[in-house]
Structures are given as C-alpha cells and as structure tokens.
Amino acid sequence: MATVDAILAAKYPAKAHARRVAERLQPHQDGRPGIIYLEAQKTRLIEDNDEPVPFRQRRPFFYLSGCLLPDSSLVYDITEDKLTLFIPPVDPEDVIWSGLPLSTDEALQQYDVDRVSITTEVNSTLASIASAHGGRAVAYNIADQVSPETKFDGFSEINKSVLKGAIEQSRVVKDEYEIALIRKANDISTKAHVAAIKASIIAENEREIEGAFIATCIANGAREQAYHPIVACGENGATLHYGRNSDALIDPVTKKKKRNVLIDAGGEYRTYCSDITRVFPLGGGFTTETRQIYEIVLQMQVECIEMLRDGVQWEEVHAHAHHVAIRGLLELGILRGSEDEIFEKRVSVAFFPHGLGHYLGMDTHDTGGNPNYADKDTMFRYLRVRGRLPAGSVITVEPGIYFCRFIIEPYLKSSESSKYIDTDVLERYWSVGGVRIEDNVLVTKDGYDNLTTTPKTVEEIESLAA
C-alpha cells in the first residue's frame, strides 16, 4: 500500500474529476457536445486598503484543476476530453514585488491538464471550440462566477443551473488522492492537538492553547485552518461553536483552574480539511463528573463508528447515538424513566442538540449532504447529512453531551419533559460544560477507516495533560 506522501507526490487528479462531473451532466446534454467553464477566485483588496483579502480558492475550480492560482480559469471540452488551464499573463510591475509567476510550461508540468495558456486567450479558445462543434455545444458554468468579459458566442445554450450541483455531488465520493490529502491534514492536526493539550499545562488563557495549535499546523505544512478553532474552557464548552477563545483558564471566584477544555480544531492541507474535537482536563486528571460524561460520549462514538459501511442509513446511526446517551444519562441519574419513552419524547435532544456529523473534504461542512433544516423532528433537524452513506465518502462522527442552560432550561420548564430530568443530580454537572469527541472516518465497502489518530482514551488524554 502506497504511503500518503507517495500518493501526494503525483499530480492532483483534475482530469478524472472533470470526467466524473461530465458524466453527471450527460442527461442535460440531449446528445449535444458540451464544455465546462470555471473561474478561480479573483484577487481582491480589503476595502480602503491596499492589502489583499485573504485568498481562498473557489472549490469548484480547484476540483477540476488542482490549481491554487488566483485570476485563472479552465475549459473542459467534454466531447474531446480536453482540459485547458488559463493562468494570468506576466505583469512586469507585479514581478518587481512578488517575483516571476509560474510559466505556462511549468504549469503544464505541475497540473493534470492537457494544455496551459494565458487568460487573454480564453475568449478565442471558447470561440474556436464553439465553431468546431458547429454551434451545437452547450456551455456549462456557475451563475455569478463568470467575469463580464467572458463571451460564449457560438454556443447553442449557456446553462448556469446544473454544473454547481454536479460538482457538489461528485465531491461526495473521494478518490485515493483526496483521501490521502484528508489523512495528511489529520496527521498534522493530530500533532497540533497534542501540542495544544501539552501547552495547557502552563497556559493561563484559551488563546495560548489556540496559538499552540495553529503554530504546530503551520510548522508542519498546514498554513490554513479548516475553520476558526474552538478552544472552550469550563462552561464555555456548552456553546457548540464558541469562538471567543480568550477566557482565563483560572476561575476568578475560586482561583482554581476550570475543569476541562474542549478544543475543536483542524488544519487544512492543500484545500482539504480535517475536523477533530477533543476534551482534556486542566490539572492532569478529569473530575469524576467530567470523566463520567466523557466515557458516555466515547461509547457513543465507538459504537457509531462500528456501524459505518457502504449504504448505512445515517439517520439510524444518529438515532443510535441518542440511545447510547440516554442509557448513560439514566445510569448517572440525570435522566429518569424508560429509555424508549425518553427517546420518543426527544428529551435527549436537550443534551445532544446537534447532528452526529457531516461530510468532510474541501469544505469542513462538505457538499452533498442534503440536510433538511425545516424538519419538525428536533432530533434530526440539524443533521447535515441525510440518507445512505456511499463507500468513499468521508464523514465526521462527533457525538456530544452538553450542559447548556439556554438549551436545557426550556425542557425543565415543560411538564412534558421535566419529569424525565432529575434537577438535583443535574446540578452537579453544569460545570462540565460540554464533551464532544470527533473523528474523520472514511466509509468503505465493508466497514470504515478512521483517518484520525489523535489520542482519545481517558488514559491517553490524562497522560498528555499531566
């Protein structure tokens, strides 16, 4: 089996991706020739400033090119199976400041394309293709992602409605190269999570832990973060997407360290994401209450990962996580009553309000999940993926139990749900905040491959935090 670095030494498989997308467009062509036209993100300046806006390549363009250059474009002639990349011409003034850019010859060696030209040749190339196909060809592009100066004269139709969806559905199933990129992002992020946990031993503020994570990512080749890191100490962990990352780790009243830290963070490697969450104690060991909740959440995750395989119904996996949570909270005495009744009444949503996971790829919340945020069933409303998981998809498995007053208190005020919650026992757990454990898992034909190797057993975590 080839190593990650050996796989990534080859070119990004842009041509294979173009063919995959073209297959999805075939029903819309009615037997006519067709082309795909995509543009890269433009260079833009910050308002009232001469500094550029931080660059993030358009994902549809990257998927069919592997190219991170701004102001570029591509044309894929579906009939001729010919992929052409257009890169900006040399700007002598820019060379003074930034050096010589990539040449067309260098780009041809670097990217999986058939031809490289400069962007001033886009319109003449499009006209030539349209003429070669006798004016019958369809031009597929994405609405609001085409420059005004780009012309599609001579094409029988300009279709702006189907390409985006075709690319998004194609992205669900990853190839070997994409899996290697996600695995690489995970490997780097594992080092960063370990560094962050170790930094907490002497840290005094959440931002120091965040800094250790980001610095380790950059040092290992992941210059960008897949998303803004979440570093939440104490009760901050009850906020799902807490982002302030600036609280002191010492409680101002007790003058003692808060119980634990939830860190949800992932580096991005060559546009592909990782998304990993861990919870660790401040002061070496988990408190009794935090450890109890941690072990329930870990059991939720372990059992759900074991259910993964080609064709598994994601809603069933999510529901199973709730059953494990209910059993654990019943054992602790936080919940009371029957497991089935608590499940049917959706009381566990008070403690586990979000979906079990989402697709992962070039976006943290990757495309193709078909969520239904209008679902009236609170247990499934925030599930970002619906339906069966195909082999080759990468999904996060991130169960959690949270003690968020804003979410739980309405359940305590409701006669329908309050009878299932023991408030005296619950009182001991507010300071736990929240526990979430998240891994990135590849679905295979007969099972799964967990791409995340970050330590997560109680013993492993406590050893790092001591």
UniProtKB/Swiss-Prot annotation:
Q: Which residues form a coiled coil?
A: none
Q: Where does Mn(2+) 1 bind?
A: D275, E398, E438
The protein's matches in SUPFAM superfamilies, at most eight in alphabetical order, are given as:
Creatinase/aminopeptidase, Creatinase/prolidase N-terminal domain
* Reaction(s) catalysed (UniProt annotation): Release of any N-terminal amino acid, including proline, that is linked to proline, even from a dipeptide or tripeptide
Supply the CDD domains for this chain.
Prolidase
Name the coenzymes or cofactors required: Mn(2+)
Q: What would be one Pfam family of this protein? A: AMP_N
Gene Ontology BP, a term: proteolysis
Q: Which UniProt keywords apply?
A: Aminopeptidase, Hydrolase, Manganese, Metal-binding, Metalloprotease, Protease
Give GO terms: molecular function aspect only.
manganese ion binding; metalloaminopeptidase activity
UniProt superkingdom: Eukaryota
Cofactor binding note of this UniProt entry? Binds 2 manganese ions per subunit.
| Positions of Mn(2+) 2 binding | D264, D275, E438
Instruction: Supply the EC number(s).
Output: 3.4.11.9
Give the family, as the similarity comment puts it.
Belongs to the peptidase M24B family.
Q: What does this protein do?
A: Catalyzes the removal of a penultimate prolyl residue from the N-termini of peptides.
Designated name of the protein: Probable Xaa-Pro aminopeptidase pepP
Gene behind the chain: pepP
